[in-house]
């Protein structure tokens, strides 16, 4: 075991537990008809659930409830632009500060406890005790609901510290390989005893800001990812971009958040003036508009592939096969222009039915050769 596993992580868990029990010990009054919805995971996860969130407002079960939505701060602009009507108020969680700053953690959990919720629903399928479950556990809610899920790969210590009966009700959410948008719809509409609605992620978006000076014809590359193992070599992106420029006359537009700057700057340095670097220059809504006007997106497994699919942009996404089925490939009924590209070994296991999606290392996508990506793009290109 590493020093992190032996010392750092147990110390973090001890600190988190101390804060949790300190908050739980503080008296708080439960108030009637106050519903908490927890969806604090990432942008892609939000895209795959947002069309279902309005069902709570329309339901008989929660008619007249004051609804509070708790989300990841990275999704705030999407929520405020498209979905603010689904809740009476929203609370935004900075997950980095929540994991690193015990004062922030304490005050955030205290805010949830003192809000006096009567009901709490955790909308996250892959949950962890230290983050997602504690948001519900500190609340005053008498009725707590979540999806039944398989265990995450956590340490024996964290498993021991996780309370045995966190939720008063666990709903079956379908097979592990079920596409998450379908899983979310099934869970929410089943919980509310409402007929299911067609599953969609579609978003309407306007023109990109004129100040971005986009080329007339272009494709988008998103080389960065919040997960350090979800990487495809810079030289592979560059070789792919050069071929698309030669073959189709398109300009590569590099996009990403400021956190992706290491990957985007490296790619822009290789491609030079033949590319446009928009790293850190687009809001999420701006990025949607850029993707809407693009001929296609080439990206690793990250939220960008779901943003692109939501505005009808053709997606060529690189995936390891980890969580196969949940986030890719997209069902044909949702889009026919989403092309998930996997390493050869993963593809063989998919064909033979031997793929254990959780056992695939996330970093396997680095093994995908440029030639394979170009074959998929050429085969599915639309002028």
Predicted regions and their residues:
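Catalytic machinery of carbohydrate-active enzymes
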Residues: 1-383
